[in-house]
Amino acid sequence: GRYEEAYRYARQPNPLASICGRVCGHPCETDCRRGKLDAPISIRALKRFLTERHGPESRNPVTVYPGRTPGILRQERVAVIGAGPAGLSAAHDLALLGYPVTMFDTAPVPGGMMYLGIPEYRLPRDVLKAQVREILDLGVTLRLNSRLGRDFSLQSLRAEGFKAILLAIGLHQSRKLRVEGEDLDGVISGIDFLLNINLGYRFSIGKKVVVIGGGNVAIDVARSALREEQRSAAEQVAMKELMDVSRSALRMGARDVHLMCLESREEMPAFANEIDEGLEEGLKIHPSLGSKRFIGSQGRLTGIETIRCSSVFDAQHRFNPTFEPGSEAVLDCDTAILAIGQASDLSFLSPEDGVQATRQGTLSIDPDTFMTTAPGVFAAGDIAFGPRLIINAVADGKKAAEQIDRYVRGPEWRPRTRLVQISILDHHQMPESYDTYSRLPVPIVPLDRRTGIAEVEVGYSEPEAQQEARRCLQCWINTIFDGNEEEGTECILCGGCVDVCPEDCLQLLRVSEGSMMIKDETICIRCGLCAERCPVHTITMEAFETFDEADIRPELAEVTRD
């Protein structure tokens, strides 16, 4: 029931906690140790529960940083170009550090692709606006409808006196499928489709719509030679776009919406809940199907010639699709929407800027400092790393803000100091039945209410949130085996800890010079029975907590990276 404290824990490291509570790809849940036992904690849904009670969109918002008054403490001006997740995150942290920050965006609204690319039924606009307002209230100046390369340039910003510039412009171009007939009327990009819907424009898409996904995203990722986690994030972003476009088409009145992609159902990224919800809403899925060409009459799309895909990846998991000759068929449609990923628009660059691009269409940066090839010009988010999740962009923005602060301060800069506090817990007890609870599915509205912009997820109730939170294994608490002969806590090899362990994760082995304790951390449930059973206190349960030095020395708050 300590909801305010829990909210601050969730919000302080994440300026977009309310947004992430609704649309985050939750990579943290992949790493959750509870998932090794049954299913991970529903971290995203619990974050939403907390922000609905105490976030900026709630009726009872709480102060995120008690005792800290935001204000301009430094003279050096910083320009942040792009009001998406990376730009907002960086502006937030720079403002807390006392910098006068001006944020520019080409769109008429802030939020980047969170506003332009995510349907309102997934991310209510009042939540997004409240989160942005909270950041602007720190003293950040916002200039909308301002396009880099058209309304201003990097050189003009330098002339205005900006000491540092952060490029966080994201990826707003749609990728091309590069097949015959792609220029027909009725073939549109997924990004343009979502952008127009989210800005309030309406247009006819006909009664039968085919949404095409996959393919190009995979090959672009493979060519970029990204690490596995980056490739996974790019695939997740592409699948989100694919599902958002498909379900939005249904909400626009199309009677027949088909989703086709090269991947088999088993190979589709793991958003099974969204796929199931789409099927309930009437979406028809055609896995393992490729687009050979678009067919038209008098310049207008009438259908797609498809071909069956037998495999997408080779044995090394490289994108290398193979197709079945003779499996061609025609799928009639009024509109085809290409949801095959995002690309950069680097038309703003000029030789005088000194900013270089990579072969993949991103900006070349130093991965440690986030600085581009131009001194004082930094880059973060998708424009620097390619398509990734919102939470990755948030992290990029925070890292970029820290490096900008380091660049501006020069020799006076001090790194953030993290302190560790270790506490021995006597008679540690976990919540009752914590190890027996199953993961609770996030509640959604009934099918007949999934219309227009009505939000599909409704979030946990208080009892549901408490039950889900009780499943946490409290990984900051660990069993410590550290006997000391002088203190009388040396292990006496009684084996009691092994006997009481309910998960059989302990083994006591004899070796030539003594004994050895082996513990399987992957199945330990932190019950503490081994520590309770140990007659000489060789085993203790100890909590490890980290915090900023500024939390105990307020005079350092100005230079702390929150």
Task: Describe the role of every protein-language-model region.
Residues 1, 5-10, 14, 40-44, ...:
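Beta1-alpha1 glycine-rich phosphate/pyrophosphate-binding loop at the start
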Residues 1, 21-50, 102, 109, ...:
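Iron-sulfur cluster-binding cysteine motifs and their immediate structural context
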Residues 185-209, 215, 294, 314-387:
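FAD-site-proximal beta/loop scaffold in flavoenzymes
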Residues 232-238, 242, 380-411:
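A conserved FAD-binding loop/helix module that cradles the flavin
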Residues 276, 280, 290-300, 312, ...:
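Mid-to-C-terminal Rossmann-like scaffold of FAD/NAD(P)H-dependent oxidoreductases
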